Curated annotation (Swiss-Prot):
This is Uracil phosphoribosyltransferase. Pathway: Pyrimidine metabolism; UMP biosynthesis via salvage pathway; UMP from uracil: step 1/1. It comes from Streptococcus uberis (strain ATCC BAA-854 / 0140J). 5-phospho-alpha-D-ribose 1-diphosphate binds at R79, R104, D131, P132, M133, L134, A135, T136, G137, G138, S139, D200. It holds the Pfam family UPRTase. Uracil binds at I194, G199, D200, A201. Keywords: Allosteric enzyme, Glycosyltransferase, GTP-binding, Magnesium, Nucleotide-binding, Transferase.
């Protein structure tokens, strides 16, 4: 079973508390999502492999560590996942970016996929699927399904806020996918929203209703 890790770094928790406030402006919300994503990126990339390389400093030759050249891909679930991409790219600017577009049917609460655009070599990449919310788990499961159908096998799911129901469903559907979140909240309400949550992340990111 994949792990669910709550990243409790003080800066992440401080910024998340501001993000949750209903009076946080669209501008500040967007900036905070980007900042939290960048901070989380340090944690979720902690196990990237290193190799020894010889370099020349201004003083002498030395053996140092650098990434092995492992290929990375960041795959946001549209719309809201877009807000987390730049934070990750600030750490790994050479990563490729794919897109999986979904919307949630407001009656059934089930996700509907309308776009899949991925790097051709997605099966060779370590993938970070990013979405601010892990609520019912439906979108996350469908996104991982789409990636696996295209040969991907090394996948992590990264969100800002998760509900226990969504974590359980994603772990049951894809036990090989590790989940990273800044907060594990109380529950889902009858409308499928996370409680206490932060509202509709997409609407708050883009100033829509």
């Amino acid at each position: 079973m994949g792990k669910c890790q709550v990243i409790s770094h003080p800066l992440i928790q401080h910024k998340l508390s501001i993000l949750r406030r209903e009076d946080t402006s669209t501008k500040n919300f967007r900036e905070l999502v980007n900042e939290i994503a960048m901070l989380m990126g340090y944690e979720v990339s902690r196990d990237l492999p290193l190799e020894d390389v010889e370099i020349q400093t201004p003083v002498a030759k030395t053996i140092q560590k650098q990434l092995t050249g492992k290929k990375l891909a960041i795959v946001p679930i549209l719309r809201a996942g877009i807000g987390m991409v730049d934070g990750f790219l600030s750490l790994v600017p050479a990563a490729k970016v794919g897109h999986i577009g979904m919307y949630r049917d407001e009656e059934t609460l089930e996700p509907v996929e309308y776009l899949v655009k991925l790097p051709e070599d997605i099966d060779q990449r370590q993938i970070f699927v990013v979405d601010p919310m892990l609520a019912t788990g439906g979108s996350a499961i469908l996104a991982v399904d789409s990636l696996k159908k295209r040969g991907a096998g090394n996948i992590k799911f990264v969100c800002l806020v998760a509900a226990p129901e969504g974590v359980k469903k994603l772990q049951e559907a894809h036990p090989d996918v590790d989940i990273y979140t800044a907060a594990l909240d109380e529950k889902l309400n009858e409308h499928g929203y996370i409680v206490p949550g932060l509202g509709d992340a997409g609407d708050r990111l883009f100033g829509t209703k």
